[in-house]
Amino acid sequence: MKKYILLLLLIPVLSFSQNLKSFISKDSTEIFYEDIGKGKTLVILSGGPGLNSDYLKEFYDTVSKKYRCIILHQRGTGKSILKKVNKETVNVNRYIEDLNGLYKALGNKKLTLVGHSWGGMLSFSYAANESDKIEKIILLNTGGITEKFHTWFGSNMNMR
């Protein structure tokens, strides 16, 4: 009976780990992502920066019934742990490098990015730098980027 109960407790853990994958980013950070569902691929980028994607679970569980959802654990969130958190390890250029690593891990196919809040702003930044790697961008509650916001955001990131 104990073995049966243990098996029941391990099933969710084992099924989660089968969907969890990783790649090594340009700065040697291991970046994790979940791969769930089948169909056209959507890369889901959570808000923050620094916010774990768990708050979007109901969304991507629903969407994964029709699409393949790649849920990126952005650096410093989820399983993508950083040894140090500072302006060298957490900045827009590093996030863009991470998306390039994901692009390669997914077979160099154009990405459809689904960005919520900060994830949408990251989608904008990625598209501005790597437009040849983008198929579509879907924005959810994302603010627009003005020169004033860009200056504020850069200052805010540099203070971290």
Model-derived regions, located:
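Bacterial Sec-dependent N-terminal signal peptides
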Residues: 1-20
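Conserved HGGG/HGGXW glycine-rich cap/lid loop of the alpha/beta-hydrolase fold
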Residues: 25-82, 86
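Glycine-rich His-Gly loop
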Residues: 44-48, 117, 142
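Active-site loop/oxyanion-hole signature of alpha/beta-hydrolase fold enzymes
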Residues: 74-114
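Residue in the alpha/beta-hydrolase core beta-strand immediately N-terminal to the catalytic nucleophile
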Residues: 112, 135-138
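Short glycine-enriched nucleophile-adjacent loop
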Residues: 120-131, 137
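Flexible "cap/lid" loop of the alpha/beta hydrolase fold
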Residues: 138-160
